UniProtKB/Swiss-Prot annotation:
PANTHER family linked: 3-OXOACYL-[ACYL-CARRIER-PROTEIN] REDUCTASE (PTHR42760:SF133), SHORT-CHAIN DEHYDROGENASES/REDUCTASES FAMILY MEMBER (PTHR42760)
Major enzyme class: oxidoreductase
Protein name: Phloroglucinol reductase
UniProt note on regulation of activity: Menadione, hydroquinone and 2,4,6-trihydroxybenzoate are not substrates and inhibit the reverse reaction by 33%, 31% and 49% respectively. 100% inhibited by 0.1 mM p-chloromercuribenzoate and by 0.1 mM CuCl(2).
Assembly, per entry: Homodimer.
Substrates-to-products reaction catalysed: dihydrophloroglucinol + NADP(+) = 1,3,5-trihydroxybenzene + NADPH
Annotated localization: Cytoplasm
GO biological process, one term: fatty acid biosynthetic process
Keyword Cytoplasm: yes
Function noted in UniProt: Functions in the pathway of anaerobic degradation of trihydroxybenzenes by catalyzing reduction of the aromatic nucleus prior to ring fission. NADH cannot substitute for NADPH.
Keyword Oxidoreductase among record annotations: yes
């Protein structure tokens, strides 16, 4: 048990010197979280499927003083993930934080959606989360050297799912199913990992946030924007930066007693 002293209180949100692996790093959310870790003193491993975009991101980050490297990988492929982890450990010696920020959706009415498209969504949003979390957790366990650390001291895993894991929507059968499955998978993984290995795993469940794919929803004069805002007590749609603090909290000692949670960060969407 850590006493409530000045050192603990002033360092509880620190990720200084940690190694953070961020998937979907070239996307809006992944880039913000990777920068947040880097600005706060973590070494960052950026991963995604587009090496060109990753290389550009490394150049940008290093110009801002962030210690980082980029490794391309498909998180839905076991061999890719195993190599990714091996290369990350070769670069920085360990992995302390995993932030899972990749995802995919292809909306369609259930009567029109092909089984192949549904399966692709499940692979991208659920199977890939299982694979990356499984093998990073194994790396975190290996780093312990047989010791059982205090809660949260074995590693932190943060997975971006969605408020759609909690509420259905027409045309989103595949997406809602995959995100709901990911939330329950995270809860079950916590039962496997937290007490024995000190690895905390949690989900953040955001509402719609600005990205290349959702930019069209941010036209304040559109009916889509106006209708969505009726369900947002906070009065606006989200920016990816809105979730940086939540991810930092779940990646730091401040959240050592939190695991298996699907944390709502929807601007109040779920209460209306």
């Amino acid at each position: 048990m850590v006493p409530c002293n000045k050192e603990f209180v002033t360092n509880m949100f620190s990720v200084e010197g940690k190694v953070a692996l961020v998937t979907g790093a070239t996307g809006a959310l992944g880039k913000v979280l990777a920068k947040t870790y880097g600005y706060n003193g973590a070494k960052v491993v950026l991963t995604g499927r587009n090496q060109g975009k990753l290389d550009a991101l490394v150049e940008e980050f290093k110009a801002e003083g962030i210690d980082c490297t980029a490794i391309s990988a498909d998180p839905a492929k076991e061999d890719d993930v195993k190599k990714l982890i091996a290369d990350a450990v070769k670069a920085y010696g360990r992995i302390d934080i995993l932030a899972v920020c990749h995802g995919f959706n292809k909306p369609a009415n259930i009567l029109e959606q092909s089984v192949e498209d549904w399966q692709y969504i499940m692979d991208a949003d659920c199977k890939s989360v299982y694979i990356i979390c499984k093998y990073v957790a194994q790396q975190m366990v290996d780093q312990l050297g047989g010791k059982t650390p205090e809660s949260g001291k074995g590693g932190k895993i943060v997975v971006a799912t969605s408020q759609r894991s909690k509420r259905g929507m027409a045309g989103y059968t595949g997406y809602c199913t995959s995100k709901g499955g990911a939330d329950m998978m995270i809860a079950s993984m916590a039962c496997d990992l937290s007490a024995k290995y000190g690895i905390n795993i949690n989900a953040i469940c955001p509402t719609v946030f600005r990205s290349e794919l959702t930019e069209w929803m941010f036209d304040v004069n559109s009916e889509v924007y106006k209708n969505f805002l009726k369900r947002e007590p906070i009065g606006r749609l989200a920016e990816p930066e809105d979730f940086a603090g939540y991810a930092m909290f779940l990646s730091s000692d401040a959240s050592n007693f939190i695991t298996g949670a699907a944390c709502d960060c929807s601007g109040g969407y779920l209460v209306c």
